Amino acid sequence: YWNPILDYAGRKAGVELLLKVARSGGESADAAARGDYDFIFSNHIFQPRVASAGYRVLLSTRDEPITGQIVTLADSPIRDLQQLAGHEVGFPSASAFVGYIVPIDELQRRRIDVKPVFGGNQEGIMAQLKAGKIVAAGVNGKLMQAYAAREGFRIRVLWESVAFDDLPVAVHPRVPAAVATAVRDALADMAGEIDGISVLRASAERIGQKPPYGFRRATQADYRRYADFYRATVLREFRASP
């Protein structure tokens, strides 16, 4: 998905953009906290322990906002969050924002103790839910809807969060401003260019992504809801300093 996009944008911006993928969400967050990446496509940058690295938002995808959900199978006897107390509930990973951090915050606010089970990624935990290995799961609502439709099963949404803007593209402060601007503009302009939209469409087809394609210019202010969440969360390990 990413390599053709980075190749196109890099040539437009006059820089080489190389893809680096961490083995897990946790490793990605750790690398971001160290400032390992010049550019990053992740919402980990809003976690308090990562925010100190100073990443600055440049772009947002044109996708619809994302929500966190707690779901169960449609034929499950569980119809209320309180019924999850004491049960194993699945999550993608401990670093997944709408898949874990937001749902577990809600459960703890309601003083509902569950036993977290991690599936490694979104589809991993969704597969466990489908197989009946867990009674419920914390998920990205948009991804859950697509997965359930593709796999042919129905879910019941027990709870859904407010909407958050989808993943941003951000830049580390060590990157020269001129380079950051060139990369931002190259990515933002792709959808309006004949060759650029062709690259975006071809990449999207590889993963079944639906339009609209590409990126729009954005700033930190567009993602203030993340900062608001981390200031108010009851999860001490994720709470931002006042």
Question: Which stretches of residues belong to each language-model region?
Answer:
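An extracytoplasmic/periplasmic, membrane-proximal ligand-sensing/linker region
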Residues: Y1-P4, V171-P242
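Extracytoplasmic small-molecule ligand-binding "clamshell" domains
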Residues: Y1-I45
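Hydrophobic/proline-rich hinge and linker segments of small-molecule sensing/allosteric domains
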Residues: V57-D80, P168-H172
